[in-house]
Amino acid sequence: MNKRKILVPLGDKSYEVTLEAGILNNISEELLKIGITKNRKILVISNEEISNLYGEKFLNNLKDNKFQAKMVLIKAGESYKNLKTLSEIYDVAFEFGLDRNSIIIALGGGIVGDVSGFAAATWLRGIEYIQIPTTLLSMVDSSVGGKTGVNHPKGKNLIGAFNQPKAVFIDPETLKSLPKREFSAGMAEVIKYGVIRDKELFKYLEIEKNKNELINLKNEYLIKIINSSIKTKSHIVSQDEHENGVRAILNYGHSFGHVIENLCGYGKFLHGEAISIGMNIAGKIAIEKGLWSKEELERQKILLESYDLPTEIPKINKEDVLTILMGDKKVRDGKMRFILPKEIGAVDIYDDVEDSLFLKFFS
Amino acid sequence: MNKRKILVPLGDKSYEVTLEAGILNNISEELLKIGITKNRKILVISNEEISNLYGEKFLNNLKDNKFQAKMVLIKAGESYKNLKTLSEIYDVAFEFGLDRNSIIIALGGGIVGDVSGFAAATWLRGIEYIQIPTTLLSMVDSSVGGKTGVNHPKGKNLIGAFNQPKAVFIDPETLKSLPKREFSAGMAEVIKYGVIRDKELFKYLEIEKNKNELINLKNEYLIKIINSSIKTKSHIVSQDEHENGVRAILNYGHSFGHVIENLCGYGKFLHGEAISIGMNIAGKIAIEKGLWSKEELERQKILLESYDLPTEIPKINKEDVLTILMGDKKVRDGKMRFILPKEIGAVDIYDDVEDSLFLKFFS
């Protein structure tokens, strides 16, 4: 079966993720299926690169089917994920006459998705939106779960909202135009799901044949791992939408990932690459605390590296590490919380990690 | 009894409005009662005028009780209810170290409340906040119901979120420092509740003695009408939080009110004054459609005027009226919807009002 559907069960905010090669070419049909009627205005938010690849065809498909659609492009890059870009979207929304019954579609990677979802959360106090992620990272992570927002000059994602999409459509075909390095970065999050909850996925990724087929972007294999990743994410998010508890485990590798992104300058490492290094650090801490086995830490390292991900910790000043960690919004009541593995497929949340325990890994 | 509590029943978002003269002097006690522990940071958002009157005492009460509190002032006036002011609040939030467990308190009128509620909705994807309205308008209207947001250069409240407060505290004593004209403007919303749902309140307001006591700001009388107003609002909001149906009746008088605010220049009429004129226009349309009696329209006019509110329609170009009405976000699928009275205490929503029917009232 080439089409997969994954339910994200969140009461009256539940929605489905539809995963199918080529789905982008039949977008109007999919919209009609989920009850988007043709009298509703659609604002498609994308960026130049994605728009050059799929924009015209996508928009034409909507217009040929009598949808009243318009596309607005935002600049690519983390530095444009800010209030100014949001403000530009509001201007277009006003000019286009986006009303309470209209809908926003995010067509692009994580930045497009996050900004679009937040625009939808806040235009006229909230209108519906749909995620169509085009990068591996956004397919397995940000497009599902409703975290939306923009950056504050002092920190990533400080401004935002929990806002679940009405639907998510994923077309693995779009990965064929994704730079190899970004594909690898997305694999870091896939491997993360393996470590935190899905031993079978981890083992699947270790198998040489699967690895080759994935790197060659075979749809069947891509669908398998995307499906598994989203299933895990859906399961966790449905238990704890607003990250008051278990959802935090999705941040495995992220605290140190943010440290690395911040201190090495945004852009040196891609998000997924920083997460890969962060997972390695978290693993080392777990060893120090006697939680995990060295053999499994080594398996994690080998798997990350086999998908061309970095694991070596860059040179970073210890004091800077502490400053960033303390400023991280995952701190609660002044206590730093870390997600540490106990075995492949199981992690837990710890707030009793001594600074000295992780600072030794930095120079 | 001098203390009133009104429940706003919204499932796990339910909260209480506490109404008591002098409650501002015991704010720490009230916070502790609703479970705000002293380790939580509190950012108080206010404006200069309110801060000059109550700010120091308020902050000292918090600090004397070992709360970690800070106050930030925003500029008064509709033109500062924008993304830039919001951005300044985010900067203070960052510097103060506002975390997920922190809380925002809005101390002031409707603008302070709307901006604060939206800041709370969007800082770290949402933290808790408390409304302490200090104007009659915000006590009976904007502090309850969770509508928060800022203006877009092209229109009021286009950017925002539904975000219910954790609690609302109302101290009628603060009305003693409110300019007479603003008190009257607030009375327009109180009278509105009479017309849309509460015939008893309407009759109460008509009684000469009550009117005099209200104008003299007698707490007992103020508490009576604020309590009645909030009860009606609470009842309606709990049926339809996101204004997909019945909540729209709270906008009685507002469509034409917005037209008047827009076209006469913001500032010429206060919001409540524009609503008063809007209610008179809505009443006239109801007469034209044969829904309402001329006697009751006259009673509405006399009541509004007896609280020093304007009812006469200013000179406005017909075409401009249409432009503003069509741009109003209450338009759904291109249809204009009007709230029209059938009798004092009962209104309904109509989407079949011919343009000619109301344009005749404009010159």
Swiss-Prot record, chains A, B:
It is an enzyme of class 4 (lyase). Zn(2+) binds at residues 189, 254, 271. Pathway: Metabolic intermediate biosynthesis; chorismate biosynthesis; chorismate from D-erythrose 4-phosphate and phosphoenolpyruvate: step 2/7. GO terms for biological process: amino acid biosynthetic process; aromatic amino acid family biosynthetic process; chorismate biosynthetic process. It catalyses: 7-phospho-2-dehydro-3-deoxy-D-arabino-heptonate = 3-dehydroquinate + phosphate. Its EC number is 4.2.3.4. Belongs to the sugar phosphate cyclases superfamily. Dehydroquinate synthase family. This is 3-dehydroquinate synthase. It comes from Prochlorococcus marinus (strain MIT 9301). The lineage of its organism: Bacteria, Bacillati, Cyanobacteriota, Cyanophyceae, Synechococcales.
